[in-house]
Amino acid sequence: MKIYIPKRNPASHKGSYGKCLIIAGAEGMAGAAYFAALSAYRTGTGLVKLCSAKENLGILQTLIPEAIILSAPKIKENFQELEKAIEWADFLLFGPGMGTGKETEDLLRLVLKKGRAP
């Protein structure tokens, strides 16, 4: 895989290599969020913002301290922090370990409505 990832310019910084928002990991599914973030870093992403269930935050901060960690909002809670993260991102990933329930579907609809990133 190394041959597919270009060498980095020594004068660059992590912000030069893209900002990824990952919305992943329902309660008890921290591993899915962790592996999604790890994959983003390993494929060259410079900055990762990881939004997961609040029960996962301590685990994720320990496993992948270089990521910016956010608590996933419930639909009826304040959505503003996630909206800011969506605007911040160059690209986003939604879904690993999120489940298939109505709350996940509603959150996905909001993300798709607000998102502009691929």
Q: Which stretches of residues belong to each language-model region?
A:
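Small-residue (G/A/S/T)-rich helix-start motifs and N-terminal tracts that mark the onset
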Residues: 1-118
